[in-house]
Swiss-Prot record:
Name of the protein in its database record: MEMO1 family protein MHO1
Organism phylogeny: Eukaryota, Fungi, Dikarya, Ascomycota, Saccharomycotina
This protein's encoding gene: MHO1
Hydrolase is among the record's keywords: no
Family affiliation: Belongs to the MEMO1 family.
Principal location listed in the UniProt entry: cytoplasm
Pfam family, one: Memo
Keywords for the protein's UniProt record, in alphabetical order: Cytoplasm, Nucleus
Organism expressing this protein natively: Saccharomyces cerevisiae (strain ATCC 204508 / S288c)
Signal peptide: none
């Protein structure tokens, strides 16, 4: 048995079990969603240090429709340290350590998926992740303690649920569609849940992104006319701009959420890609989100209520007012199916 150590415990979050459990439990019970939300089978949530994003993150987990029939939870996260293309990397560990208890990896599913090939060239679509890459990445690990705390909160034994971590980097549209086809079969099974790990806008020169819009209408016009948004520079006169930078960031982030909420299911993937191209918004989990959108587009019979995105909470690490400032945005979302 190979156990992935909790490499970010003691830095990104507490390595003391009682302290960590109390912190996360407090976030969960303070979220206005007492949940679970019926048929909320996919959540989108941030992956920063818990003191920054924990309160927002908790809204996603409080909504998750956990029940005693759940057998597997997929966790999709972006890669922050390595670049790869047209493949999904899956954890090669059999167990994942957290200070609150360990989670078992669905190793049987790993063996099944690494046999899947891209029909165009026979290349494997799923590949085991090397241990160093796995241990360096925080986007997947930051979901684990919150998941364990939520399972305990819902009185579900850790022994009854397996997880399946997946790292996503750069895929072509065709590969996204191919992977979406595979994952859609698992989404159709209500005993599978999905966690998509993503922060929203990373704003500031240190992130090489200073996009600005003065209003929702201005952004809507840019999308319709396919013109890129303004990028602020040190020479930009902020007094000539309609709203403070932090409000502009929120306008762009909420437009991203609205794109996912309001676009018909079969058109979401393309609308999402267009939004990203026009705004350049630095949503670090844009690629895992794209994979999920591709998978959802394959689901033709989603029940009487269809597929719906909801966004119960949003926050920013700080309010940017100057070109010299920076911030990261956090959004909690859930997707109901049926």
């Amino acid at each position: 048995m190979s156990i992935r150590p909790a490499t970010h415990a003691g830095s990104w979050y507490s390595n003391r079990a009682q302290e960590l459990s109390q912190q996360l439990h407090t976030y969960l019970i303070k979220s206005t969603l007492k949940g679970p939300i019926h048929n909320a089978r996919i959540i989108i949530c941030p992956h920063a240090g818990y003191r920054y994003c924990g309160p927002t993150m908790a809204y996603s987990y409080a909504s998750l429709d956990l029940n005693r029939n759940v057998k597997r939870i997929f966790i999709l996260g972006p890669s922050h340290h390595i670049y790869f293309k047209n493949q999904i990397l899956v954890s090669a560990f059999s167990e994942l350590e957290t200070p609150l208890g360990n989670l078992k990896v669905d190793t049987d599913l790993c063996k099944t998926l690494i046999q899947k090939e891209y029909p165009e060239n026979g290349k494997k679509l799923f590949k085991p992740m090397d241990h160093d890459t796995d241990m360096a990445e925080h986007s997947l690990e930051m979901q684990l303690p919150m998941l364990v705390e939520t399972l305990k909160w819902r009185e579900i034994s850790l022994d009854t649920v397996k997880v399946f971590p997946m790292m996503v980097s750069h895929n072509s549209v065709d590969v996204d569609r191919c992977i979406g086809n595979i994952l859609s079969e698992y989404i159709k099974d209500p005993n599978n849940l999905f966690i998509v790990s993503s922060d929203f806008c990373h704003w500031g020169r240190r992130f090489q992104y200073t996009g600005y819009v003065g209003s929702k209408e201005e952004l809507n016009d840019a999308i319709q006319e396919e013109t890129e948004v303004e990028m602020l520079t040190a020479r930009s006169k902020l007094s000539h701009h309609q709203v403070p930078i932090w409000q502009s960031i929120e306008i762009m982030d909420r437009y991203a959420m609205k794109t996912l909420s309001d676009t018909p299911n079969g058109e979401r993937y393309d609308a999402w890609k267009q939004y990203l191209e026009i705004t350049g918004n630095t949503i670090c989990g844009e690629k895992p989100i794209s994979v999920i959108l591709s998978a959802l587009s394959k689901i033709r019979d989603a029940g009487p209520s269809g597929i719906k995105f909801q966004w119960p909470n949003y926050s920013q690490s700080s309010h940017v007012t100057s070109i010299d400032d920076s911030s990261v945005s956090y959004a909690s979302g859930y997707v109901t199916i049926g």
